[in-house]
């Protein structure tokens, strides 16, 4: 049974993280109907987050190698006093802006006493005996996706990412990642609304999702109250990496062929259902 749990949880997390359908909202539904409202962290959840990050990095290996090279060359330029914050190299600017987006996420590591870190405090809002907020978050995610679909039909996105969208993405990511939103769905949508090129927006979103997932995974491992076996960990890691690699390709296919509306309608339907359930929970609990 523990092996089946590892298999299904790895697939579930990979699908809900990479496709814009919100892992947190689906997880909250599972915990709600299991009457688990404590918000305890599972070591298996943490290790799968790390594995999904690895899978995304493998799927986008060329981009990650290029960014690592840019980072190394930047350090070299700093040592030699040749670094320029306004470098015109697109790859260097991409790296600079990704760092800008990630800086606000350091706030997650603020200690919050018995609650652990600020991240775990924000995350605990999912386990409040009602699915009302998750339903709202899912519908907002769907709204972002529909807005993007509309934007792409009326204008051509031809901008490169700059500091302003990078800062906005960082603040948005800080707020939404622990809640019932889809991180990839909302961040990708925000970038497209800013007019960023579609391919660059998707690459940027997936790129910054890797450190976000790594931080989440490490925090969950450090604060885990539910243990896992070595066999569970190995199986979950392998499945999550493979599934994530495939799902990145699938997401790119959806974006390239203008199929995001299917995911937007799924978010709408699922969000509406759990919103109604949440209303009844508020009335009868």
Which residues does each PLM region occupy?
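Multi-pass membrane proteins that catalyze or facilitate reactions on polyprenyl-/lipid-phosphate substrates
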Residues: 1-285
């Amino acid at each position: 049974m523990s092996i089946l749990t590892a298999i299904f949880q790895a697939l579930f997390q990979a699908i809900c993280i990479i496709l814009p359908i919100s892992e947190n909202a689906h997880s909250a539904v599972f915990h709600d109907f299991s009457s688990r409202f404590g918000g305890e962290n599972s070591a298996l959840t943490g290790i799968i987050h790390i594995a999904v990050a690895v899978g995304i990095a493998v799927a986008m290996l060329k981009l990650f190698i290029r960014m690592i090279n840019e980072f190394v060359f930047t350090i070299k330029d700093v040592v030699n006093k040749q670094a320029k914050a306004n470098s015109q190299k697109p790859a260097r600017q991409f790296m600079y802006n990704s760092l800008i987006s990630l800086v606000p996420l350091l706030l997650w590591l603020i200690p919050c006493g018995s609650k652990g870190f600020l991240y775990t405090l924000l995350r605990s809002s999912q386990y409040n005996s009602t699915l009302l907020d998750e339903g709202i978050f899912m519908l907002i995610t769907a709204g972002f996706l529909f807005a993007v679909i509309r934007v792409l039909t009326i204008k051509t996105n031809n901008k490169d990412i700059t500091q302003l969208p990078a800062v906005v993405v960082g603040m948005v990511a800080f707020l939404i990642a622990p809640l019932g939103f889809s991180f990839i769905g909302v961040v990708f949508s925000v970038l497209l609304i800013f007019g960023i090129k579609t391919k660059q927006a998707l690459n940027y979103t997936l790129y910054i999702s890797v450190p976000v997932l790594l931080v989440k995974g490490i925090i969950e491992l450090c604060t885990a109250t539910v243990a896992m076996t070595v066999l569970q960990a190995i199986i979950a890691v392998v499945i999550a990496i493979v599934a994530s690699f495939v799902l990145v390709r699938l997401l790119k296919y959806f974006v390239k062929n203008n199929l995001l509306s299917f995911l937007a309608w799924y978010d709408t339907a699922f969000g509406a259902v759990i919103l109604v359930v949440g209303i009844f929970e508020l009335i009868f609990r």
